[in-house]
Structures are given as C-alpha cells and as structure tokens.
Amino acid sequence: MLRFATAVLVAASFAAPAAAQVQRAFPQNALRGAIVIGVAPDIQLNGRPARLAPGSRIRDTNNMAVVPSGLTGGRYLVNYTVDTYGLVKDVWILRPEEAAVRPWPTTPNEAQAWQFDPAGQVWIKP
C-alpha cells in the first residue's frame, strides 16, 4: 500500500505542471483591440464595423477554436490579425495575464514603429 501511495504522489507531481497554461506565441503582425461579435461575419472592432474573413479562426482563453455564434453579443479584449483584404483573419481572446502585457500596438503604424521581441512576446517603443 505504501508503494502505491508513493507512486501516486510521484505521478501527481509530474501531472501538476502539465495542467498549467502555456504562454501563447502571437505573431508580429497581431494587433490589440476590443471586439463585439454580431451575426457572423459582421463584428465591431474597436467600435467600428468590420468583417471576419472566410476561414477565420477564433481562439478562446484556453486556445481552443470556437465558432462566432457561440460568442455573439459578448465584448472581448483580443489580439487579432488582418488579411490583405482588410478582413479579420485570426482572433485570440486574451487571458488576464496576456491583457496585462503592455504596450501592445493597436494600429499597423504603431506596429511598424515599435520593435517586437518574439521570445518574450513584448513590444518595445523607440
């Protein structure tokens, strides 16, 4: 019985770190904004009308893919990318610790002027 209890404790010590959330790596072209999802593909991005691209991906706080209809009407702080046609392509709903990372560009002009550290997932203003 003692060996079994020891084995369970050892196994639990390895399983605990696996349950921790992994830091997500956002691409350099990801911008930050507030999104309100209406009837897909229509959304409000930073208070302005926008559209989701065909095949767009929305990731929740657990990095799981979600469909826009499950998020209708909610307001979320997100990082997002835009395709060449100006449509919103990828959306990541931010966890509180990700939202606390500042500064993060909200416009393409800011992203071009600042420097991005992909390893640390931080932006550096000049």
Q: Across the structure, where does each feature detected by a protein language model lie?
A:
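Beta-strand/loop nucleic-acid-binding surfaces
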Residues: A50-V66
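Hydrophobic core
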Residues: L9-P17
